[in-house]
Amino acid sequence: YRQRQGCRDMELRDCYAEFGGDYKEVLGRLEREQTVQKFVLKFLDDKSFSSLETALQNRNYEEALRFVHTLEGICRNLSFTRLYESSSRMTEAFKAGDFENAAAGMPQLSDDYHQIIRAVEAYKTCREG
C-alpha cells in the first residue's frame, strides 16, 4: 500500500479496500470507526489461523473445524468478505465430513488471511507514525 499512496493518507476504509472487505457494512454494524479500528487491530493477535494450521498438520479435524468456524465468525462480524467466504467454505466442508476438500481450501484461506494481515499491519504502522 505504501508504494501506491502516502502512508499518512491511509484510512481504515483504504485498508478494507486493500483486502476485499466491506467497510460500509462493518461501519453500519459497529457504528463508530474507532470501534471498527479497535477490533481490526485486535485481529492481528487472534490465534485462530495459527491454531487451524496446527490442527490441520496434526490431522485433528475436530479442532480444525472449531478454529475455522471461529475465524469465520470473526470475519463475518468484521466484514472481512474474502476471508469470510474462504473460511465459510472450509467450515461447511468440515461439517459435511469432507476433510479432504476442507483441507484443500487452506491455500486460498491462507492467501486471504495474509492479505488482511499485511493490510492491517500497514495501516497500524501508518497510524503509529
Language model regions located:
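Two-component system phosphorelay core
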Residues: 1-66, 70-129
